[in-house]
Amino acid sequence: WGESFGLSKDFATAQRLVAGLRRIGFDYIFDTTFAADMTIMEEGSEFLERLPEIKESGLPMFTSCCPGWVKFIKSQFPDMAGRLSSAKSPQQMFGAVTKSYYAEKLGVDPEKIFCVSIMPCIAKKDECTWDGGKDVDAVLTTREVERMFKAFFIKPEELGEDEFDDPLGSGTGAGVIFGATGGVMEAALR
């Protein structure tokens, strides 16, 4: 996130981003690592459930965590769409947890929660409209966050560091590598 401000990766920490988001006015700020763990646990369970069918047909089960990939399969290879996992992406998984478990934990009506994700890919915006779901209400790209920082006259080099809110505990290393190439498979194998 700090590249557009000319910040080194050592200085542009997630904690500095959190501090900037709090200054903008976000009430709670979470890391989606835990949600990536939940997604991979769901996909792993589904894989084990489907394993007899997979062995018989020789066809794989595909991850469903990338909306661009899901849309590609459904539009270009509709005969393979049944091979997609039914698990929600980490973004959507966390939105659902926010509006159920976390709302209850805070004693807040889920309807009063407006859940915003910050994602590097614009396909995540489209994902929020699928199946009538409103687990995530809005998605900001990292470029849009940069513009927000500038609109609020936030200078990252002047920010301290702040911690993420911790709704369910820490995520694992598997959740951290989820977004890297091959990360979903490595997380599943862990």
Please state what every model-predicted region is.
Residues 1-190:
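Iron-sulfur-associated redox domains of electron-transfer enzymes in respiratory
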